[in-house]
Amino acid sequence: MTKRIVLMIISMLALGILIAHLAASPAPHHAYFDQFSPEQYPLVIAHAGSELYPTDTLYALEQYAAMDVDVLEMDVHMTADGEIVLIHDDTVDRTTDGSGDVREMTLAEVQALDAGWYWTQDDQDYPFRGQGITIPTLREGFETFPDYAMIIEIKQEKPSMAAPLCDLIREYGMEEKALIPSFNDESIQEFRAACPEVATAAGHDEVQDFVIRGFLLLGGTISLEFEALQVPEKDNGIPIVTRLFLWFAHNRNVQVHIWTINEPDEMERFIDMGVDGIMTDRTDLLREILGR
């Protein structure tokens, strides 16, 4: 009798959790996603460009735009004189012929460097050296691609670039064109406070919380402050992007963008699973698979 009561209690709790999850309010729809038609899904998201072109450069973005990708992804830091520039790392060492911390350099110093210097596919030829490729400003990105959907990842943690980034987005009327992610939870919270009208992706801790609560069927208890989850397939060997994860996210009206997928068989697998976007260095392969 006791065992039966325990089982009944467990069943009722499980049912209650499931009902709470199903009844949970979805995230409000954001106008950022209105720029995509149903036929565009999954979105072809051009990862900053390291495999085919010099990363985070206007040259790379121009090549991807010519391929008619759906979204241009880029990374941003801020210079010592307050200019927001496209670059992945904290320093210029890995991608240019210079050295130094971006936040300690002026825009003039940053843009004097060759951003095509270290790009190579075979460690022998460096075809972009001396071609006039520089580190661009985000302002240049907005002026060059005013009608393109963008994902602008905040890489710099300190000093905060939330307010300057928000000001620039508003200046160019990109509030419904830009989606802002950051691995750093403090950075993304600062941006949301400064720019509540712009769509954001979940920070690292928010992703972990969503995964854990979803696994425990408590996904409906999360108060959502984000419109998208941008995640790898696994984190520390633990699967993240599963069909159940996608169901939880879509049930809350949250899109799932997976990164960084460059192999055709993996692309096909995630297309079949129903992800909303695939971030890739090989947009050419993904577009071919999608028949575009």
Set out the residue ranges of the language-model regions.
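Metal-dependent phosphodiesterase/phospholipase catalytic core, i.e.
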Residues: 5, 10-16, 20-33, 40-41, ...
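Short extracytoplasmic
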Residues: 38-71
